[in-house]
Amino acid sequence: NRIYREKGIITAFKEAGFHTAFFSNQRPNHSFIDFFGMEADEWKFIKEDAPEETNISDDELLKLVDKQLNDGHRKLFIVLHMYGSHFNYKERYPSDMAVFRPDSLTDAKYENREYLLNAYDNTICYTDGFLASLIEMLQRTNASSAMLYTSDHGEDIFDDDRKLFLHASPVPSYYQLHVPFLIWMSEAYRKGYPVQYEAVCMNREKPVAGNASVFHSMLSLGGIQTDYKEDSLSVASKRYVSRPRYY
C-alpha cells in the first residue's frame, strides 16, 4: 500500500521550499491524519489539552492562520483540519448564527429529522462563513495565494428507506460520497500561474471521482514538479481526466 511507503503532501511542499504548518480542531487519535500532519514545520491540535467536553469552534484555526500570514514566510503552505459538520451538529455553530430553525432537538432519531437537518444546514452556513473569512485574510495580504477546500465525507441523516445516520456505513451511500471541492485563487495568483488558473476554469464542471485529486491538484497549484504527480488526477492541469463516480 503506497500510503505506508510515500511521503505526504506536506513534505512535498516542504521539500519545495515552503514553510509548512498543520493545524487541527480535532483531537489526535494515532491516525494517518496525525502522522502526515506532524510532518509539518509547525503543527498543533488545538483540542489536545482541552477537557473532553470543551467545544472549540473552527474559527480558532483562523487565529493560527493569521499568525502564519504575518510571520514573513516567503513561501507558505497551511493545512487546516476542521471539525466541520460532525455530530452533534448543534454544537458546531453559535446559536445566534442559526439560519434554519427549529434546531433544538438533537437526539439521533428519525422523528427528529427536521431538527437534525436544520442543524446540519446551519453547520454548512457556518463553514461558508469560515471560508469567507479565510479568503478575506488571504486577500488582505495581496500575495499570490490559492485555497483548496474539500471534505473527507458527507453525511446520512435518515435520507431514504434505509434510515442511515452519520457516515460509517459498510457500503457508503450517495450522501456520504458527494462532497464539496472548491478552489479559490487570488488575482496575483491568477496572473502568476495562468496555466493553473485556465485549467481550473476549464475543468470546473467536470466530476471529481476520488480524494487522490486533492493531492495532485495541490501539487499543481503549488507549481511543484515531482515524479509522483499525475496530471490526469489534477483539476489544476489541462491534462485532467474525469472518471466515473461511484454514484
Give the positions of each predicted feature.
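Catalytic domains that recognize anionic headgroups
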Residues: 1-247
